[in-house]
Amino acid sequence: MPRKGPAPKRPLVVDPVYGSPVVTQLINKVLQDGKKSTAERIVYGALEGVRNKTNSDPVATLKKALENVKPALEVRSRRVGGATYQVPVEVKAGRAQALSLRWLVGYSKARRENTMTERLQNEILDASNGLGAAVKRREDTHKMAESNKAFAHYRW
């Protein structure tokens, strides 16, 4: 085991178009097979579509969508004796951000629109309005934590 503690977080390069680290994180989540320019084209196209549909700042809309998708609680498996319990725990800020981006991109891929740009754009718009599959995933996660509240004393 390392003795120096966890590795330091690398600084995130802000994207050149919007100057926002959140957009950079979204690009990195969309990224597949190292094709960064394709991922950038998808994300920038989706954000441009958000701007056209809402006539407002697309980064603000994205941040609102992420806030609506971020989970506050989740369940983690904990083995006690012979039984495995689903223990509700609070989600740290960094993990909440990562989960919200992962869910947003994942449920964008599952949508029925033609291009990934359209899918991502519509999922961002739905999430910013409190709708969509990513928001439902957050609600399901919270519901699971609520129903397992009895095991909260096993928290670590």
UniProtKB/Swiss-Prot annotation:
One of its GO terms (molecular function) is structural constituent of ribosome. Keywords: Ribonucleoprotein, Ribosomal protein, RNA-binding, rRNA-binding, tRNA-binding. Pfam families: Ribosomal_S7. The keyword Oxidoreductase does not apply. PROSITE patterns: RIBOSOMAL_S7. GO terms for cellular component: small ribosomal subunit. InterPro entries: Ribosomal_uS7, Ribosomal_uS7_bac/org-type, Ribosomal_uS7_CS, Ribosomal_uS7_dom, Ribosomal_uS7_dom_sf. One of its GO terms (biological process) is translation. HAMAP family: Ribosomal_uS7_B. Belongs to the universal ribosomal protein uS7 family. Part of the 30S ribosomal subunit. Contacts proteins S9 and S11. PANTHER family: RIBOSOMAL PROTEIN S7. One of the primary rRNA binding proteins, it binds directly to 16S rRNA where it nucleates assembly of the head domain of the 30S subunit. Is located at the subunit interface close to the decoding center, probably blocks exit of the E-site tRNA. This is Small ribosomal subunit protein uS7.
